[in-house]
């Protein structure tokens, strides 16, 4: 995959120069095509493209013989682009979009057919987002189940790098299409993203109207490649330095994927974004991830809002997958638990004050020892997508009384005189499997601290106690599941009883050692 990106990176300036010298010609943006999904109400969908400076462009939306609306604009001289914002449309279709350029009484007409209105989601990240349906559990069954989802349309962006922000995509691996077993299972780590497809399928089952899915991902890539220079500067990310060879296998240069694979989409009206990335930062700028990730979210939101003429919500819903596990990393390595924590901006949960309107799928219990693609690529993407869609239903669609996150303590009470810590959760808890090592306390004595296991003592429906009598000093902190491989497949100790959502990892500091001291951890 690197070679094509390098080749295209070399010829790209020549291609763009040749097009511009010829006036670029009259065309839609690269991703406006037959079978596409445009964002439904309350937002207006953006239609744009390139043309001859000074020409008038009329965009017509038709359904059968009926004209639904017309919008008129002109081609901007400085960019050779034109753009219109359609009136908000109810979900449904199909429609035809026609664009006509008029200059000195000469007309050129473009048409795209079978256009639907629904919700458009962008899916991005590295290889776990890039894994195709062909690579997951029960692939044959999943690939045969496409006929019922012809209103879920898919598009996959080609892996391309660029030194500067591009206005339009250079290439598309899969143009807007109806799902088939062929385009959903097109090889390994190509197209279409399994997480993206399964997430969209769950949304369609719930919403019963069209869903558009855009996959733009590249394996082995750090967050710096997906971030604009603005957001990296805001976090004080140092200029390109050495990168551990085992952390990054794809493009790593700052902003090159933002420039070529995300920025060209920013004129599009979106419903939201789903993100699965972080493995390539476990040994690279790890300590900055609690800034670079929230900064990426903020920058993408601002850029898409501005690019779509204010049609994409300023704080559109942003979903993330918290990292799973990897057998190749030592259990003592801190990279995986650190990134999991930083994925929440060090709150342990989302949404939070630094990451508003976000939702998260915990995946640390979906480990896969026997994955032929390496344990870092677990094959159970169905559960990932299911957990993601619960968050989307709650945050993006406002569904009430829906459990979409696992239990997290809201209070920790130190009972030092009894040798206990008491944890009170804001949700009900269920002990799936007792593990006396997954909770750890930081025990300090003579200015030296070490982490010791704290075994589970008693458990009730919403609280548990931990034995801390192994600490002969001062207990200053508590952490849960702070390891690369916390448990076997769906066998972590704590889950929500009815939703089967795992308790997420956390770390909490205990600052007061008085009897009965309480520390707030979550919400």
Curated annotation (Swiss-Prot):
Q: Name one GO biological process term.
A: carbohydrate metabolic process
Assigned GO CC terms: extracellular exosome; extracellular space; lysosome
Protein name from the UniProt record:
Sialate O-acetylesterase
Effect on the protein of changing residue 479 to C: In AIS6; defective enzyme secretion and activity
Can you name the source organism?
Homo sapiens
The protein's Enzyme Commission number: 3.1.1.53
UniProt-listed PANTHER family: SIALATE O-ACETYLESTERASE
What is known to happen upon mutating residue 447 to R?
The mutant enzyme has normal activity and is normally secreted
């Amino acid at each position: 995959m690197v070679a094509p990106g390098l080749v295209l990176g070399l010829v790209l300036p020549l291609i763009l120069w040749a097009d511009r010298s010829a006036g670029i010609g009259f065309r839609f943006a690269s991703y406006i095509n037959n079978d596409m999904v445009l964002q439904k109400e309350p937002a207006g969908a953006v239609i744009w493209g390139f043309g001859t400076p000074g020409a008038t462009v009329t965009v017509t939306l038709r359904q059968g013989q009926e004209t639904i609306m017309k919008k008129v604009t002109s081609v901007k001289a400085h960019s050779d682009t034109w753009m219109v914002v359609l009136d908000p449309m109810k979900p449904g279709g199909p429609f035809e979009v026609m664009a006509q350029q008029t200059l000195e009484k000469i007309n050129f007409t473009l048409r795209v057919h079978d256009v639907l209105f629904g919700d458009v989601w962008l899916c991005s990240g590295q290889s776990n987002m890039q894994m195709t349906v062909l690579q997951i559990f029960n692939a044959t069954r999943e690939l045969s189940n496409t006929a019922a989802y012809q209103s879920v349309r898919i598009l996959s962006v080609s892996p391309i790098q660029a030194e500067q922000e591009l206005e339009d995509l250079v290439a598309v691996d899969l143009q807007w299409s109806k799902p088939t077993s062929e385009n959903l299972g097109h090889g390994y780590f190509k197209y279409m993203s399994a997480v993206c497809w399964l997430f969209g399928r769950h949304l369609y089952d719930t919403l019963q109207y069209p869903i558009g899915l855009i996959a733009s991902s590249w394996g082995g890539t750090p967050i710096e490649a997906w971030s604009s220079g603005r957001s990296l500067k805001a976090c004080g990310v140092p200029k390109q330095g050495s990168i551990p060879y085992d952390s990054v296998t794809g493009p790593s240069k700052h902003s090159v994927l933002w420039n070529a694979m995300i920025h060209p989409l920013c004129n599009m009206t979106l419903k939201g974004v789903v993100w699965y990335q972080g493995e390539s930062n476990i040994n690279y700028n790890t300590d900055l991830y609690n800034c670079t990730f929230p900064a990426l979210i903020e920058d993408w939101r601002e850029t898409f809002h501005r690019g779509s003429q204010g049609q994409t919500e300023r704080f559109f819903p942003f979903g993330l997958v918290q990292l799973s596990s990897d057998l190749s990393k030592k259990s003592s390595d801190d990279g995986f638990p650190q990134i999991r924590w930083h994925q929440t901006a060090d709150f342990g949960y989302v949404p939070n004050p630094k990451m508003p309107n976000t939702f998260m799928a915990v995946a640390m219990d979906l480990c896969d020892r026997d994955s032929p693609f390496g344990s870092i690529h677990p094959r159970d993407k169905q559960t990932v997508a299911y957990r993601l869609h619960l968050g989307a239903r709650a945050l993006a669609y406002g569904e009430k009384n829906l459990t979409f996150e696992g239990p997290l303590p809201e209070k920790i009470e130190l009972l030092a005189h009894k040798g206990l810590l008491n944890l009170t959760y804001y949700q009900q808890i269920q002990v799936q499997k007792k593990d006396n090592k997954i909770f750890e306390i930081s025990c300090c004595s003579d200015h030296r601290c070490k982490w010791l296991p704290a075994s589970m003592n008693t458990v009730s429906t919403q609280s548990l106690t931990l034995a801390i009598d192994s600490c002969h000093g001062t207990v200053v902190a508590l952490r849960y599941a702070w390891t690369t491989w916390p448990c076997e497949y769906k066998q972590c100790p704590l889950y929500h009883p009815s939703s089967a959502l795992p308790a997420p990892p956390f770390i909490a500091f205990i600052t007061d050692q008085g009897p009965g001291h309480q520390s707030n951890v979550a919400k």
